């Protein structure tokens, strides 16, 4: 599925009165867990954006994986530049809560990241994830290369067959390439569950294994 930002504005009923900002929100450019930069050129590393509900729990899933160099919480897929959390939660910017995952493909494969993505949430729920309801919680994969797009699309077909067998409905995950702009969330949301170990995490998978072929 290839959607333009203009199409997304219509789809999510973006409030055109929300004009956003011309400059990024302030960012402490140091990962709270591993000390690596959150924002960088990341030369020699690969990048992908995953949205699977609230980005607090989603980010923790990925920073724990060997081969993941950095992660950051942010917003993407909408029509308002540099939005705030409050604006995104209004449902009027069109953005999804996403996690930017920067990884070393010689240590962890893209297929391994996809397996974590599919198995860690319910991709059939549309504009919600568990008790978290709203367009910002939709399931998305924003690809930075055509190879990622092909692999993600193929994995969706494989996982759909497995979900069908288990009695689930159609996957609603958006897979986009090229990736829309990623806007870093406020500092308080970065690595939130490392700063607040008892904080809220509403993620929950289907219990269905994603049996895609892993390239290791």
UniProtKB/Swiss-Prot annotation:
| A single GO molecular function term of this UniProt record | L-methionine-(S)-S-oxide reductase activity
Q: Which family does it belong to?
A: Belongs to the MsrA Met sulfoxide reductase family.
Show the taxonomic lineage.
Bacteria, Pseudomonadati, Pseudomonadota, Gammaproteobacteria, Lysobacterales
Fetch the Gene3D superfamilies from UniProt: Peptide methionine sulphoxide reductase MsrA
Q: What is its EC number?
A: 1.8.4.11
In Swiss-Prot or TrEMBL terms, this protein is called Peptide methionine sulfoxide reductase MsrA
HAMAP family per the UniProt record, alphabetical: MsrA (MF_01401)
Give the reactions, separated by semicolons, that this protein catalyses: L-methionyl-[protein] + [thioredoxin]-disulfide + H2O = L-methionyl-(S)-S-oxide-[protein] + [thioredoxin]-dithiol; [thioredoxin]-disulfide + L-methionine + H2O = L-methionine (S)-S-oxide + [thioredoxin]-dithiol
Q: Where is the active site?
A: 54
Protein purpose:
Has an important function as a repair enzyme for proteins that have been inactivated by oxidation. Catalyzes the reversible oxidation-reduction of methionine sulfoxide in proteins to methionine.
What is the scientific name of the source organism?
A: Xylella fastidiosa (strain M12)
InterPro entries assigned to the protein according to its UniProt record, in alphabetical order: Met_Sox_Rdtase_MsrA_dom, Met_Sox_Rdtase_MsrA_sf, MsrA_MetSO_reductase
One Pfam annotation reads: PMSR
Transmembrane feature ranges: none
